[in-house]
Amino acid sequence: ATIDPAVLFIDRCLQLLKPGGRLLIVLPDGILCNSGDRYVREYIMGKKDEKTGEFVGGKAIVKAVISLPSDCFKLSGTGAKTSILYLQKRHANPNQPEQFLPEPQTDVFMAVAETLGYVVKNNIEDYNAGVANDLDKIVSAYKRGE
């Protein structure tokens, strides 16, 4: 069976993080919402316990998901819809370093960036077009806990 390279990349990023380390990664939206990629979400967050509603066994806590504009990577030749995923690696159990401590998945901050501070004209990014960068407002809202 073939494995999506994005999945291998996520796995490697999590391996390289120290316990408690943070990761911001741009991913295709399919990984975040396609039913066929559920195993990726369960690998990251763990499986949801139907009784408690808690996620058990995951490698990371999802802190935020920020949806990016569909034309964000247009100049690189892709029209794939993407999002920024912000994760924090769970802390290792001191008695069993290969196991993670059962840290609760907190509420996930979610936002949509409609503009990134530029427009594409004649295959060139124009940053002087007077377009706002929604990421500034989104980061401020995250820091305020909104």
Task: Report residues per predicted region.
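A conserved structural/catalytic subdomain of Rossmann-like adenosyl-cofactor enzymes
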Residues: 1-146
